[in-house]
Amino acid sequence: MLLIWLLLLTIVTLNFWLRHKYDYFRSRGIPHLPPSSWSPMGNLGQLLFLRISFGDLFRQLYADPRNGQAKIVGFFIFQTPALMVRDPELIRQVLIKNFNNFLNRFESADAGDPMGALTLPLAKYHHWKESRQCMSQLFTSGRMRDVMYSQMLDVASDLEQYLNRKLGDRLERVLPLGRMCQLYTTDVTGNLFYSLNVGGLRRGRSELITKTKELFNTNPRKVLDFMSVFFLPKWTGVLKPKVFTEDYARYMRHLVDDHHEPTKGDLINQLQHFQLSRSSNHYSQHPDFVASQAGIILLAGFETSSALMGFTLYELAKAPDIQERLRSELREAFISTATLSYDTLMTLPYLKMVCLEALRLYPAAAFVNRECTSSASEGFSLQPHVDFIVPPGMPAYISILGLHRDERFWPEPCVFDPERFGPERSRHIHPMTYIPFGAGPHGCIGSRLGVLQLKLGIVHILKQYWVETCERTVSEIRFNPKSFMLESENEIYLRFCRSSL
């Protein structure tokens, strides 16, 4: 009997404690989405039980009808108060104008896991700044044009041959997009950053894919690791999460150790030169520094880039008029040449519009966050926009997926309409309502390369094939609740029909 009373007392005490915690925004007069006072998970319940994707969760928080016209909305990451920023000007304040008050991302790796803690996305400001400056030299427009493009053309040619082999003597065939797009993007990544002639499209398999997919295998430990890194950063020293699996970390270390192309100027070479130019006690001298950056570059581009290419093909298949207009533009571009130059590819207007619209519906980053690092003891004031001071340590989230599908800024937001980015309508796009790769100093380092890769892949598919929906094509995209990235929960199938330009 005593045990029952103690249990009841504990439950009631916990409930009162949670009520107090969850009263944070109400007591300050800030619009908020109150979680159940019986749940210690805050607003993360569906995510923690793998019922909703990261992107969909933050979109729901952003678009909740209870928010009305609120510029910021409070919610809870377990018991930690967090902000959802919904106003474009405040988004600009957080990501760009007042970057010095929001220097870090909220997530954090365990310091005892250097393979995770040293990576560009998880490194804290001073380490991040140096690493970013080093790695950004690989992504200049000049290098993309003069060095990368020819290598990417080779992979794009392999993509054409891959489809030719899949169809054989047939005029059309229904194919899944996932494997093809993954082979394409990992072949590009291996060639550009590790000087590896991966050849996944030629062989139909890739060790890079095998190793990377292991990171997405869902098990209780992996779920705990991801949730710890993203939502319990202060507990990582206790929970000891691993960003990479041991097998993946070992593979990346071997890849770096076996790298023997000092003249290539690839990612590994660039990072090794960075190490040589720093003192012996510099953070970059850690044995895992190069492997950690190599590992995160592959991971960041693997699912994001391949899924985006699949989504773009899916939308083109559902909109034959848009696909025909794009193919007409490509047909004209290919009249006098068998291969498009970098400059020609980058100046095709309708191709650009199609890719921009694909990135609106399926942004490379579904959400971003920044942790308030204001040196002022009370925090950073959002006045005159909102009467609220963001305290040091509080995370501010931006749902890019929510922003890009907000009917306040995008009429018929779920309709695939490249004309939004045409000469007439693009002038009316509200600043900071289109940020598919994030924005500001922490914006995606590989954004331009990602767009180039998408354009090249789409061009070399449509050059030889017409794509259309079939009986196996999903009627709508549902995002995988077991993936951190935006990827389809179900495989996307399309019919590929031989139709040279």
Curated annotation (Swiss-Prot):
Q: Name one GO cellular component term.
A: endoplasmic reticulum membrane
* GO biological process per UniProt: ecdysone biosynthetic process; insecticide catabolic process; regulation of developmental growth; response to DDT
Which InterPro entries does the entry link to?
Answer: Cyt_P450 (IPR001128), Cyt_P450_CS (IPR017972), Cyt_P450_E_grp-I (IPR002401), Cyt_P450_sf (IPR036396), Insect_CytP450_Detox (IPR050476)
Q: Which cofactor does it need?
A: heme
* Pfam families, per database record: p450
UniProt topology in membrane: Peripheral membrane protein
Positions binding heme in this chain are 444
Gene Ontology MF, one:
heme binding
Where does this protein chiefly localize?
endoplasmic reticulum
UniProt xrefs under Gene3D superfamilies: Cytochrome P450
Keyword Metal-binding belongs to the record: yes
The enzyme's main class, written as a single word, is: oxidoreductase
Superkingdom as given in the UniProt entry: Eukaryota
> Quick check: keyword Metal-binding in the entry?
yes
This protein's UniProt keywords: Endoplasmic reticulum, Heme, Iron, Membrane, Metal-binding, Microsome, Monooxygenase, Oxidoreductase
For this chain, the family text in UniProt reads: Belongs to the cytochrome P450 family.
Functional description taken from the UniProt entry? May be involved in the metabolism of insect hormones and in the breakdown of synthetic insecticides.
- The identity of this protein, by name, is Probable cytochrome P450 6t3
